[in-house]
Structure formats: C-alpha cells, structure tokens
C-alpha cells in the first residue's frame, strides 16, 4: 500500500473528475497496458464522496405574465448555480435583475446558438435547440458515452450545461414556464420545437 503522502497529489489532481470519468480513465489505462487486447476481465468501481451542490435551471416564462415575478423570485431564492435558457426568458431575467443581457460572440458553434451573460446568472443560453443537444448528450452518457470528449471540452451552451448537470450538480431543480412561443408552432420546423415539456421530462429522467 503506497504511503498517504504519495496518494495526496492524485486525490487533488482528480478531484474535479466525475466517478464515471475516473472509471473510464482506469479502464482505458488497463486496455493500454494490455496492448489493446485485454487478456482477462477488468472491473472498475468508483465512488465519489462530495458535498452537495444545487443547480437550478429555468426555461421559458410562465403562461400568465402576472406569475413572472413570483417565478423569478422563487428561482433566485434557491442557493447554488443558476442556468437560464431561452431568449425571452433571458430578456425577462435581465429585466428582473436590472442587468443587461450581453451576447457572447467569442465562441461560435455551427450547431448551437450563441450564449449570453447576465450578472448574477451562471449560464445563459438559447432554449429548445440547446436543451435538445443536452438531452442527446445525456442519453449518450448513459449509453456508450461516445460524446464525452465533445461536451467536456467544447464551450457552447449545451456543453456548458451538460458539464454542470452531469458532473457538478448533486441536486437539480427545473423551472419550466408554460408560455407558448409562436415561433415554435411552425409546422415546417422540427418536432422538437413543439415539445419543450417533453424535452425537460426526458432530461430529468436521464439525470435521475
């Protein structure tokens, strides 16, 4: 058994890694040591003990504008990180906080709409397209995990949300407004534009 002094640098180095990421690294190293052709079974079990970290995600304003202040107050009364998704939701959030919504144009993705910043909010993104991509990442994460190298490195809105939900959060609260976005009712647009609630429900099930 190695002395504690030699273990400490490793515990510090890998502290930010998720249990699944550590297990994957160990399995990959075993495959490497076997020269790419494992001669026996390899089993890795990883348990990560950590403090609870709450993340709150809001997408869409309420159907009744009179409920907006109540929704915003409840959302920002929760501790932890705050994610705001959707153009209208971001604008209303900026008005509620009395802060400008500043578009981020330093990182452009061909697939995901640009992010923005609002003082007091950790992540600000577009709505349905971004959450659809997060759901794709979540399904893959529970399966073959082939997209891990994408969302852990890329700086688009979907990747930033995925990192926060999959690797940082222990408790996640969703705030889903039921206001109808007229732009999403075009029958020529992909069906995912019409199922915001279903997207969030599927994502919630994946996270559980």
How should these model regions be labeled?
Residues 11-73, 99-103, 107-185, 189-208:
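C-terminal catalytic subdomain
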Residues 66, 71-97:
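Active-site beta-strand/loop microenvironment that shapes enzyme catalytic pockets
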């Amino acid at each position: 058994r190695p002395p504690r002094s030699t273990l400490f640098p490793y515990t510090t180095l890998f502290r930010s890694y998720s249990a699944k990421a550590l297990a994957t690294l160990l399995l990959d190293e075993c495959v490497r040591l076997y020269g790419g052709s494992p001669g026996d079974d390899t089993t890795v079990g990883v348990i990560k003990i950590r403090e609870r970290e709450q993340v709150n995600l809001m997408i869409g304003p309420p159907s009744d504008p009179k409920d907006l202040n109540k929704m915003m107050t409840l959302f920002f009364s929760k501790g932890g990180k705050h994610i705001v998704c959707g153009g209208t939701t971001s604008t209303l959030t900026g008005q509620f906080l009395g802060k400008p919504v500043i578009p981020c144009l330093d990182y452009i993705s061909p697939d995901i709409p640009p992010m923005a910043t609002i003082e007091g909010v950790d992540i600000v993104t577009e709505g349905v397209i971004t959450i659809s991509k997060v759901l794709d990442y979540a399904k893959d994460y529970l399966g073959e995990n082939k997209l891990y190298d994408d969302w852990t490195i890329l700086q688009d809105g979907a990747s930033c949300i995925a990192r926060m939900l999959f690797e940082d959060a222990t408790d996640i609260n969703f705030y889903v407004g039921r206001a109808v976005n007229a732009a999403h009712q075009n029958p020529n647009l992909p069906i995912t534009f019409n199922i915001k609630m279903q997207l969030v429900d599927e994502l919630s099930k994946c996270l559980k």
